[in-house]
């Protein structure tokens, strides 16, 4: 069983990141790292279904959602497994990421290994935007950078 993973995110623009995942036993997954090149403010941060970046971030598919739920916030009962919420970039364009999530895993049916991590252009409305797109994607706009999550030593 994997206990650590890493993801290097890149896109067509200046946004890039290295994000680390760690899980002890069946406990929550700690997600930490730094994203650079963002505009100041909130940006949606999600695990997407496929580990396929052959056509850029669009080939990663929809949010990772094996339980067929509607999009929501990371603390909501109704959420996609891959819904990690927002990261906040300061005026320097840097977002320091520190998330503890009890829904994703590094093994089993909820495993994010081999899937794509994506940072988006806009803020995630956490499924509360009052329209169909909100309950699918959080109205977060384009995909700025992405990478496939892989097992690390």
UniProtKB/Swiss-Prot annotation:
Palmitoylation helps nuclear targeting and decreases catalytic activity. Succinylation, adjacent to copper catalytic site, probably inhibits activity. Desuccinylation by SIRT5 enhances activity. GO terms for molecular function: copper ion binding; protein phosphatase 2B binding; protein-folding chaperone binding; superoxide dismutase activity; zinc ion binding. It catalyses: 2 superoxide + 2 H(+) = H2O2 + O2. Disulfide bonds join 57-146. Zn(2+) binds at residues 63, 71, 80, 83. It is an enzyme of class 1 (oxidoreductase). Its cofactor is Cu cation; Zn(2+). SUPFAM superfamilies: Cu,Zn superoxide dismutase-like (SSF49329). The modification Phosphoserine is found at residues 102, 105, 107. Cu cation binds at residues 46, 48, 63, 120. GO terms for biological process: auditory receptor cell stereocilium organization; embryo implantation; glutathione metabolic process; heart contraction; hydrogen peroxide biosynthetic process; intracellular iron ion homeostasis; locomotory behavior; muscle cell cellular homeostasis. It is found in: Cytoplasm; Nucleus. The keyword Oxidoreductase applies. Its EC number is 1.15.1.1. Belongs to the Cu-Zn superoxide dismutase family. Homodimer; non-disulfide-linked. Heterodimer with SOD1. The heterodimer CCS:SOD1 interacts with SLC31A1; this heterotrimer is Cu(1+)-mediated and its maintenance is regulated through SOD1 activation. This is Superoxide dismutase [Cu-Zn]. It comes from Oryctolagus cuniculus.
């Amino acid at each position: 069983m994997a206990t650590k993973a890493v993801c290097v995110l890149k896109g067509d623009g200046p946004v890039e990141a290295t994000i680390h995942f760690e899980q002890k036993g069946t406990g929550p997954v700690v997600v930490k790292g730094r994203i650079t090149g963002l505009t100041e403010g909130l940006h949606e941060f999600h695990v997407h279904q496929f580990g396929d970046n052959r056509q850029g971030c669009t080939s990663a598919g929809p949010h990772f959602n094996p339980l067929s739920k509607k999009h929501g916030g990371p603390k909501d009962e109704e959420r996609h497994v891959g819904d990690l919420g927002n990261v906040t970039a300061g005026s320097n364009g840097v977002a320091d990421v520190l998330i503890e999530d009890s829904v994703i895993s590094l093994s089993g049916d909820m495993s994010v290994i081999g899937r794509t991590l994506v940072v988006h252009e806009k803020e995630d409305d956490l499924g509360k935007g009052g329209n169909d797109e909100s309950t699918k994607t959080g109205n977060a706009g384009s995909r700025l950078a992405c990478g496939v999550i892989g097992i690390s030593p």
